[in-house]
């Protein structure tokens, strides 16, 4: 039997969003649906389309400070349909949980943001500052034409975000038990070690790049890059992929390809890590090429208005004392933080994200809506 909360405005909007199969970089009309509701409460709507990516910038108000809800309408592929208990884009509520791709990551958060804004504006039509929405369809993909491009556009016209709340599913066991007040930086290296191909029976006529590289890779894997700090764990170096050889057992390969990644704290910089890696490769006498991919700088939102408001709102709405953390992967917050904005991530429990049978507790979305509205009140109603 359905409970009243499974037919609430936030649940109905969540279901409408899930029903649109917006596998990255598709939006499938999700942003239009959100924009229509935001326009009805006084938001100025500005679509920003860059190549295959649909973005939305919506703002209510012209003065600062600017509170921005940030999120994404794209979802990851569904995987094996046969393993889903229900069709992934035909959302249903079962035993108090709404099922469907994107339920937790992050269409439930998007619905909560919109409904929180509607309720807040109805109660506080003359609020201070501005409320904004920065929504993209390119968060789960290559993140080339999404939030980063919108931020560049805003920066070019000197439009600043003061506080950004990203709706990523931050919670672990209970809604609001964890928020992300920062993220580690991410740096990827694509290394090619050159050798000389030859017959395994005549190693003196070849140069095996696997043998050459192995001591250097072992040294890189043993290094303590830093000790971390009170906000970040120590920097991590991980080899993600390694490939060499022709597939034949009698051929020494001519090159070795290695992909590795750093997740790094604020104790080091990307430039420092690069210099140390190059020093080790050179010390081992390797002939190599290397390309670097900068996936995002580390950022941290310390004590201040946004973190304080978030902590207080979560406790007042849910009774939970939240734990600010910087663990986990990257998010689009990494593109907003360098502008000087304070950034916090708060969203549903993340136990089923990117999995088959993704779901979110319906009552949690009501609580999340309440948290979002309370944060707005604390920051824009002083």
From Swiss-Prot:
Residues annotated as binding Zn(2+) 2: 105, 140, 354
Cofactor binding note of this UniProt entry: Binds 2 Zn(2+) or Co(2+) ions per subunit.
Cofactor (UniProt): Zn(2+); Co(2+)
Active site feature: 74, 139 (proton acceptor)
Pathway noted in the entry: Amino-acid biosynthesis; L-lysine biosynthesis via DAP pathway; LL-2,6-diaminopimelate from (S)-tetrahydrodipicolinate (succinylase route): step 3/3
Family: Belongs to the peptidase M20A family. DapE subfamily.
Descriptive protein name: Succinyl-diaminopimelate desuccinylase
UniProt organism field: Shewanella amazonensis (strain ATCC BAA-1098 / SB2B)
Lineage start: Bacteria, Pseudomonadati, Pseudomonadota, Gammaproteobacteria, Alteromonadales
Gene: dapE
């Amino acid at each position: 039997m359905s409970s009243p909360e499974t037919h609430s405005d936030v649940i109905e909007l969540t279901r409408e969003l899930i029903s649109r199969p917006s596998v990255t970089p598709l939006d499938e009309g999700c942003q239009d649906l959100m924009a229509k509701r935001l326009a009805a409460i006084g938001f100025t709507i500005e679509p920003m389309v860059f190549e295959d990516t649909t973005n939305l910038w919506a703002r209510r108000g012209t003065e600062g400070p600017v509170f921005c809800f940030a999120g994404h309408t794209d979802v990851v592929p569904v995987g094996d349909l046969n393993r889903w208990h229900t069709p992934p884009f035909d959302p249903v509520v079962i035993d108090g949980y709404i099922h469907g791709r994107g339920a937790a990551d992050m269409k439930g958060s998007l619905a909560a943001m919109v409904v929180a804004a509607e309720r807040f504006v109805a109660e506080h039509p003359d609020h201070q500052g501005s409320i904004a929405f920065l929504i993209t369809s390119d968060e789960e993909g290559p993140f080339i034409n999404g939030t980063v491009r919108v931020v560049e556009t805003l920066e070019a016209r000197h439009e600043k975000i003061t506080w950004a709340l990203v709706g990523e599913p931050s919670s672990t066991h209970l809604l609001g038990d964890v928020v992300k007040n920062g993220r580690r930086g991410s740096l990827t290296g694509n290394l090619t070690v050159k050798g000389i191909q030859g017959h395994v029976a005549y190693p003196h006529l070849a140069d095996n790049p696997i043998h050459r590289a192995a001591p250097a890779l072992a040294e890189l894997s043993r290094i303590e890059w830093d000790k971390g700090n009170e906000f970040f764990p120590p920097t991590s170096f991980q080899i993600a992929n390694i490939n060499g050889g022709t597939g034949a057992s009698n051929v020494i390969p001519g090159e070795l390809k290695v992909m590795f990644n750093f997740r790094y704290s604020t104790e080091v910089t990307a430039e420092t890590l690069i210099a140390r890696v190059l020093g080790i490769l050179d010390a081992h006498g390797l002939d190599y090429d290397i390309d670097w991919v900068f996936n995002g700088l580390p950022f941290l939102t310390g004590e201040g208005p946004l973190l304080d408001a978030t902590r207080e709102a979560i406790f007042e709405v849910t009774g939970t004392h939240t734990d600010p953390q910087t663990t986990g992967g990257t998010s689009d917050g990494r593109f907003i933080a360098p502008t000087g904005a304070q950034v916090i991530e708060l969203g549903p429990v993340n136990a089923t994200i990117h999995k088959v049978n993704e779901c979110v507790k319906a009552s949690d979305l009501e609580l999340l809506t309440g948290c979002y509205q309370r944060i707005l009140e604390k920051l824009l109603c002083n």
